Amino acid sequence: MEFLVQKIGMSRTIDANSTPVTLLKVLQAKVCQLENGKALVAYAMHKKHNKAIEGQQKKYQLSKEFNHFATLKASQQKELGDLDLSALETLKRVKASFKTKGRGFAGVMKRWNFQGGPAAHGSRFHRRPGSIGNREWPGRVQKGRKMAGHYGNELVTCQNEVLSFDKESMVLVLKGSVAGFSGAYGRIRAV
């Protein structure tokens, strides 16, 4: 069973052993279609609206706030309507999938923790990658070479222990951290 969530942020438990926790808001979703253990769900996110979304809302008789669609694994869901959240109350562990913070085009020191060169005394080799090849053989740069490039914005999945779930406020409390910035959208699924 999968659920759509939004990361609220991090906090800690107030007891003898202070435990770092992540707070996730479980999004209200409507099941529009069920097929082979998968569910097409609609959920509210921002105010994006166009004719294609309008057509989908008309097709599935949705109100205007449900303007995004996603496919989730929903083996226990038997009927259309609100997504069944009863499974969240008994969960012990979940896999949380989020995109990491995007850092744009980054150099080798930031992206791969390269040491860099001397900072002074006539050196012109400060933050550069250095040599990237071998000799006449292989005569090319080998695959997997650590270089400057796009850093972050990758899907990362980690397992977390569930500490509690508040059904009224729809807040799930996980032990430890998950990837992404506060406000990021992601998915959780039962382990």
From Swiss-Prot:
The keyword rRNA-binding is annotated on this UniProt entry: yes
Key words, A-Z: Ribonucleoprotein, Ribosomal protein, RNA-binding, rRNA-binding
Keyword Ribosomal protein: yes
SUPFAM superfamilies found in the cross-reference section: Translation proteins (SSF50447)
MF terms in GO: rRNA binding; structural constituent of ribosome
Region (Disordered) residue spans: 119-138
Subunit annotation: Part of the 50S ribosomal subunit. Forms a cluster with proteins L14 and L19.
UniProt similarity note: Belongs to the universal ribosomal protein uL3 family.
NCBIfam families to which the protein is assigned, alphabetical: L3_bact
Protein name: Large ribosomal subunit protein uL3
Native source organism of the sequence: Helicobacter pylori (strain ATCC 700392 / 26695)
Record lineage: Bacteria, Pseudomonadati, Campylobacterota, Epsilonproteobacteria, Campylobacterales
Recorded name of the encoding gene: rplC
